[in-house]
Amino acid sequence: MKKIVIIFLILFLNHKYAYSRNIGETEITTEDGIEVFQEEKYYLLKKNVQIVSDEFELNGNLVKIFFDKDLYDIQELIASTDVNFKSNIYNIKGKGETLKFNIKNEQINVTGKKSELYLETTEMFSDGSITVNNLTGSFAIQWSNSKLISDTIFITGFMINGSLLNKSGSREISNLEVQDENILSIITEDTEMFSKKAFYDSENSIIELFDSVTIKRGNEIITGDYGVLDTYKNAYKVSSKNSNKVKAIISNTKWANFNYLTTG
Protein backbone atom coordinates (compact mmCIF):
# COMPACT_ATOMS: atom_id res chain seq x y z
CA MET A 1 0.00 0.00 0.00
CA LYS A 2 1.35 3.37 -0.99
CA LYS A 3 2.26 5.70 1.81
CA ILE A 4 1.14 9.23 1.07
CA VAL A 5 2.04 12.24 3.12
CA ILE A 6 0.36 15.51 2.22
CA ILE A 7 2.13 18.70 3.26
CA PHE A 8 0.17 21.92 2.88
CA LEU A 9 2.47 24.91 2.56
CA ILE A 10 0.09 27.39 4.19
CA LEU A 11 2.81 29.42 5.88
CA PHE A 12 4.94 29.28 2.77
CA LEU A 13 2.11 30.42 0.53
CA ASN A 14 0.66 33.14 2.70
CA HIS A 15 3.94 34.64 3.87
CA LYS A 16 6.17 34.15 0.86
CA TYR A 17 7.23 37.79 0.93
CA ALA A 18 8.83 37.23 4.35
CA TYR A 19 10.89 34.26 3.24
CA SER A 20 14.38 34.57 1.82
CA ARG A 21 16.00 31.50 0.28
CA ASN A 22 19.55 30.77 1.42
CA ILE A 23 22.34 29.32 -0.72
CA GLY A 24 21.99 25.54 -0.96
CA GLU A 25 18.25 25.60 -0.26
CA THR A 26 15.44 24.78 -2.67
CA GLU A 27 12.33 26.96 -2.50
CA ILE A 28 9.08 25.28 -3.58
CA THR A 29 5.69 26.97 -3.74
CA THR A 30 2.41 25.35 -4.83
CA GLU A 31 -1.29 26.04 -4.32
CA ASP A 32 -2.40 22.42 -3.79
CA GLY A 33 0.43 21.20 -1.57
CA ILE A 34 2.81 18.25 -1.90
CA GLU A 35 2.03 14.52 -2.06
CA VAL A 36 5.04 12.46 -0.97
CA PHE A 37 5.42 8.80 -2.02
CA GLN A 38 8.17 7.55 0.27
CA GLU A 39 8.50 4.02 -1.09
CA GLU A 40 8.52 5.10 -4.73
CA LYS A 41 10.83 8.01 -3.85
CA TYR A 42 9.00 10.82 -5.58
CA TYR A 43 6.63 13.62 -4.72
CA LEU A 44 3.96 15.52 -6.64
CA LEU A 45 3.44 19.26 -6.73
CA LYS A 46 0.16 20.58 -8.13
CA LYS A 47 -1.15 23.89 -9.44
CA ASN A 48 0.98 27.00 -10.02
CA VAL A 49 4.18 25.27 -8.99
CA GLN A 50 7.36 27.30 -8.69
CA ILE A 51 10.75 25.80 -7.84
CA VAL A 52 13.82 27.94 -7.20
CA SER A 53 17.23 26.47 -6.39
CA ASP A 54 20.89 27.30 -6.93
CA GLU A 55 20.87 25.25 -10.15
CA PHE A 56 17.55 26.14 -11.79
CA GLU A 57 14.14 27.80 -11.71
CA LEU A 58 10.98 26.08 -12.94
CA ASN A 59 7.29 26.92 -13.29
CA GLY A 60 4.47 24.50 -14.17
CA ASN A 61 1.09 23.20 -13.07
CA LEU A 62 2.07 19.61 -12.32
CA VAL A 63 5.57 18.57 -11.27
CA LYS A 64 6.80 15.10 -10.34
CA ILE A 65 10.15 15.06 -8.53
CA PHE A 66 12.21 11.92 -7.96
CA PHE A 67 14.62 11.84 -5.02
CA ASP A 68 17.19 9.41 -3.62
CA LYS A 69 18.31 9.70 0.01
CA ASP A 70 15.82 12.34 1.11
CA LEU A 71 13.40 14.92 -0.30
CA TYR A 72 16.25 17.34 -0.95
CA ASP A 73 18.34 14.82 -2.91
CA ILE A 74 16.59 15.55 -6.22
CA GLN A 75 17.56 13.25 -9.11
CA GLU A 76 15.02 14.02 -11.81
CA LEU A 77 11.91 16.10 -12.32
CA ILE A 78 9.06 15.92 -14.82
CA ALA A 79 6.84 18.97 -15.28
CA SER A 80 3.75 19.45 -17.44
CA THR A 81 1.32 22.17 -18.53
CA ASP A 82 2.73 25.62 -19.33
CA VAL A 83 6.25 24.74 -18.27
CA ASN A 84 9.03 27.34 -18.12
CA PHE A 85 12.58 26.42 -17.17
CA LYS A 86 15.77 28.41 -16.65
CA SER A 87 19.23 27.49 -15.41
CA ASN A 88 21.96 30.10 -15.26
CA ILE A 89 24.52 27.55 -14.12
CA TYR A 90 23.90 25.43 -17.25
CA ASN A 91 23.26 28.46 -19.52
CA ILE A 92 19.98 26.97 -20.69
CA LYS A 93 16.30 27.89 -20.66
CA GLY A 94 13.18 26.55 -22.32
CA LYS A 95 9.44 26.04 -22.31
CA GLY A 96 6.92 23.51 -23.59
CA GLU A 97 3.98 21.30 -22.72
CA THR A 98 6.16 18.80 -20.86
CA LEU A 99 9.70 19.02 -19.54
CA LYS A 100 11.95 16.29 -18.14
CA PHE A 101 15.22 17.22 -16.45
CA ASN A 102 17.72 14.63 -15.20
CA ILE A 103 19.97 16.54 -12.83
CA LYS A 104 22.64 13.85 -12.48
CA ASN A 105 23.07 13.34 -16.24
CA GLU A 106 22.38 17.02 -17.01
CA GLN A 107 19.92 16.02 -19.72
CA ILE A 108 16.83 18.04 -20.50
CA ASN A 109 13.91 17.09 -22.76
CA VAL A 110 11.08 19.41 -23.82
CA THR A 111 8.05 18.07 -25.70
CA GLY A 112 4.83 19.41 -27.18
CA LYS A 113 3.78 22.07 -29.65
CA LYS A 114 5.83 25.26 -29.75
CA SER A 115 8.58 23.74 -27.63
CA GLU A 116 11.60 26.00 -27.20
CA LEU A 117 15.10 25.53 -25.83
CA TYR A 118 17.83 28.16 -25.66
CA LEU A 119 21.43 27.14 -25.05
CA GLU A 120 23.66 30.22 -24.92
CA THR A 121 23.41 31.61 -28.49
CA THR A 122 21.82 28.46 -29.95
CA GLU A 123 18.02 28.37 -30.27
CA MET A 124 15.98 25.19 -30.82
CA PHE A 125 12.29 24.94 -31.72
CA SER A 126 9.90 22.05 -32.44
CA ASP A 127 6.30 20.87 -32.28
CA GLY A 128 7.59 17.49 -31.12
CA SER A 129 10.67 16.96 -28.98
CA ILE A 130 13.92 18.73 -28.09
CA THR A 131 16.61 16.92 -26.10
CA VAL A 132 19.97 18.31 -24.96
CA ASN A 133 22.65 16.59 -22.89
CA ASN A 134 24.75 19.27 -21.26
CA LEU A 135 27.58 16.85 -20.38
CA THR A 136 28.13 15.36 -23.84
CA GLY A 137 26.88 18.32 -25.86
CA SER A 138 24.57 16.10 -27.91
CA PHE A 139 21.15 17.33 -29.02
CA ALA A 140 18.13 15.97 -30.91
CA ILE A 141 15.26 18.00 -32.39
CA GLN A 142 12.43 15.97 -33.91
CA TRP A 143 9.03 16.33 -35.52
CA SER A 144 7.32 19.07 -37.50
CA ASN A 145 8.41 22.72 -37.44
CA SER A 146 11.82 21.78 -36.04
CA LYS A 147 14.43 24.52 -36.29
CA LEU A 148 17.92 25.28 -35.05
CA ILE A 149 19.22 28.85 -35.11
CA SER A 150 22.63 30.18 -34.14
CA ASP A 151 24.69 33.26 -34.93
CA THR A 152 25.97 31.68 -38.15
CA ILE A 153 23.35 29.21 -39.35
CA PHE A 154 19.59 28.60 -39.73
CA ILE A 155 18.37 25.00 -40.09
CA THR A 156 14.94 23.44 -40.62
CA GLY A 157 14.09 19.75 -40.88
CA PHE A 158 11.94 16.96 -39.49
CA MET A 159 14.96 15.54 -37.64
CA ILE A 160 17.97 17.61 -36.53
CA ASN A 161 20.58 15.69 -34.54
CA GLY A 162 24.09 16.75 -33.64
CA SER A 163 26.48 17.87 -30.96
CA LEU A 164 27.85 21.12 -29.60
CA LEU A 165 31.50 21.59 -28.74
CA ASN A 166 32.71 24.13 -26.19
CA LYS A 167 35.26 26.43 -27.82
CA SER A 168 36.67 29.48 -26.07
CA GLY A 169 33.80 29.52 -23.59
CA SER A 170 30.98 29.22 -26.14
CA ARG A 171 29.27 26.24 -27.79
CA GLU A 172 29.62 25.63 -31.52
CA ILE A 173 28.09 22.94 -33.73
CA SER A 174 30.68 20.19 -34.20
CA ASN A 175 28.63 17.70 -36.22
CA LEU A 176 25.13 17.57 -37.59
CA GLU A 177 22.63 15.24 -39.24
CA VAL A 178 19.43 16.66 -40.73
CA GLN A 179 16.63 14.75 -42.47
CA ASP A 180 13.26 15.64 -43.93
CA GLU A 181 11.15 13.56 -46.35
CA ASN A 182 10.00 16.79 -47.94
CA ILE A 183 12.87 19.32 -47.97
CA LEU A 184 15.26 20.50 -45.27
CA SER A 185 17.09 23.82 -45.36
CA ILE A 186 20.50 24.97 -44.15
CA ILE A 187 21.10 28.68 -44.53
CA THR A 188 24.34 30.49 -43.80
CA GLU A 189 25.37 34.09 -44.34
CA ASP A 190 25.99 33.67 -48.08
CA THR A 191 24.62 30.24 -49.03
CA GLU A 192 21.23 28.52 -49.02
CA MET A 193 21.16 24.71 -49.18
CA PHE A 194 18.17 22.40 -49.62
CA SER A 195 17.93 18.61 -49.74
CA LYS A 196 16.30 15.62 -48.04
CA LYS A 197 19.34 14.60 -46.02
CA ALA A 198 22.44 16.49 -44.86
CA PHE A 199 25.55 15.87 -42.77
CA TYR A 200 27.99 18.40 -41.34
CA ASP A 201 31.49 17.56 -40.12
CA SER A 202 33.22 20.54 -38.50
CA GLU A 203 36.57 18.75 -38.26
CA ASN A 204 36.75 18.50 -42.05
CA SER A 205 34.66 21.66 -42.66
CA ILE A 206 32.32 19.73 -44.96
CA ILE A 207 28.54 19.83 -45.47
CA GLU A 208 27.15 16.95 -47.56
CA LEU A 209 23.68 17.09 -49.15
CA PHE A 210 21.71 14.12 -50.50
CA ASP A 211 18.59 13.86 -52.73
CA SER A 212 16.76 16.81 -54.34
CA VAL A 213 19.76 19.06 -53.75
CA THR A 214 19.68 22.79 -54.40
CA ILE A 215 22.48 25.21 -53.57
CA LYS A 216 21.94 28.95 -53.93
CA ARG A 217 24.70 31.50 -53.67
CA GLY A 218 24.45 35.02 -55.01
CA ASN A 219 23.05 34.78 -58.55
CA GLU A 220 23.88 31.08 -58.84
CA ILE A 221 21.38 28.25 -58.36
CA ILE A 222 22.55 24.67 -58.92
CA THR A 223 20.49 21.50 -58.45
CA GLY A 224 21.33 17.80 -58.53
CA ASP A 225 21.33 14.58 -56.52
CA TYR A 226 24.38 15.24 -54.36
CA GLY A 227 26.11 18.37 -53.12
CA VAL A 228 29.13 19.14 -50.99
CA LEU A 229 30.14 22.47 -49.47
CA ASP A 230 33.63 23.11 -48.11
CA THR A 231 33.11 25.78 -45.46
CA TYR A 232 36.86 26.30 -45.02
CA LYS A 233 37.62 26.86 -48.71
CA ASN A 234 34.24 28.52 -49.27
CA ALA A 235 33.64 26.33 -52.32
CA TYR A 236 30.94 23.87 -53.36
CA LYS A 237 30.02 21.38 -56.07
CA VAL A 238 26.88 19.55 -57.13
CA SER A 239 26.72 16.22 -58.94
CA SER A 240 24.14 13.73 -60.18
CA LYS A 241 24.33 9.98 -59.68
CA ASN A 242 21.16 9.03 -61.50
CA SER A 243 20.79 11.25 -64.57
CA ASN A 244 24.41 12.34 -64.99
CA LYS A 245 23.09 15.85 -65.38
CA VAL A 246 23.10 18.94 -63.21
CA LYS A 247 20.90 22.00 -63.60
CA ALA A 248 22.30 25.47 -63.10
CA ILE A 249 21.07 29.01 -63.46
CA ILE A 250 23.28 32.06 -63.28
CA SER A 251 21.90 35.58 -62.98
CA ASN A 252 18.88 35.97 -65.28
CA THR A 253 19.87 33.38 -67.87
CA LYS A 254 17.57 30.47 -68.66
CA TRP A 255 18.02 27.02 -67.22
CA ALA A 256 20.72 24.99 -68.94
CA ASN A 257 21.41 21.28 -68.66
CA PHE A 258 25.02 20.16 -68.71
CA ASN A 259 27.25 17.34 -67.52
CA TYR A 260 29.09 18.91 -64.60
CA LEU A 261 30.93 17.14 -61.83
CA THR A 262 28.98 13.98 -62.56
CA THR A 263 29.66 10.84 -60.60
CA GLY A 264 27.62 8.34 -62.61
What are these regions (language model features)?
Residues Y17-G264:
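N-terminal amphipathic/hydrophobic interface segments
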Residues I4-F12:
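Sec-dependent N-terminal signal peptides
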